[in-house]
Amino acid sequence: MPELPEVESLVAFLREHAVGRVVARVETPGIHVLKTYDPPPSALQGLAVTGVCRHGKFLDLDATGLHLVVHLARAGWLRWRADLPPAAPKMGKGPLGMRVHLADVTGGPMAGFDLTEAGTQKRLAVYIVRDPHDVPGIARLGIDPLAPEFTVDVLAGLLAGNRSQVKGVLTDQTCIAGLGNAYSDEVLWEVGLSPFKPAGNLTASDVARLYLAIDEVLRGAVARAEGLAAKDLKAEKKSGLRVHARTGLPCPRCGDTVREVSFAAKSLQYCPTCQTDGKPLADRRLSRLLK
């Protein structure tokens, strides 16, 4: 799933390549991706792209006051195309959900981007709104961890008295906007905390170290992706992960085997030596199979 660093990098890429262009055409071969119908996609036609920003994991393309807001969900992606085919894509065929044609006002070639989604879950979501906060997910977002307002005291307030597992608090978008499954694993490994530890049980020292780890992991990922083309961001993310998606491989810190806990639609990874005093966490999916 694209998280804060990847969306931040896509924002930077689109600021460079899309701002100043004019929306020539919007095609929605995957009509299921469109979550709003007023204004319609045709309302974007003829509007100049004036800005691009991020709200948590949401990407917001501002077309002269009308906003194309995208949530890439777990398997969605934005693919920039320097030369879009003139023929309209077939409805409902393949991974393509939306295609946005962007004209060059200086007379250069037509470019644009495709919004695609792998798999069958169909969670890629696109909203066309006059105010980004009309998108329910944006309206509910918590604080951005890269914002100046996100301080160690703010984090302490989110965790204090919270009975949820610390992993759950970190990935709750109404608490902290933009941190997801992958980078929360990285943060917890960095600070040496079990993902299952109750958030309210963290000491002041734990909270201080967790705050620094959130900042370092996210800013480090953003810095590594700086200047990369959209097509290269996935590979960069994978290469920078030290525990997430590395089940069965040695921990880069201590050499122990990275373990996994599986859930219905996702999994987390951790190092027993670094995070759980050498004790493997119960894999709930395996436990259900053995019943």
What are these regions (language model features)?
Residues 1-4, 145, 149, 203-211:
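Generic detection of long, well-ordered alpha-helical segments
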Residues 68-190, 198:
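Phosphate/anion-contacting hairpin/loop surfaces
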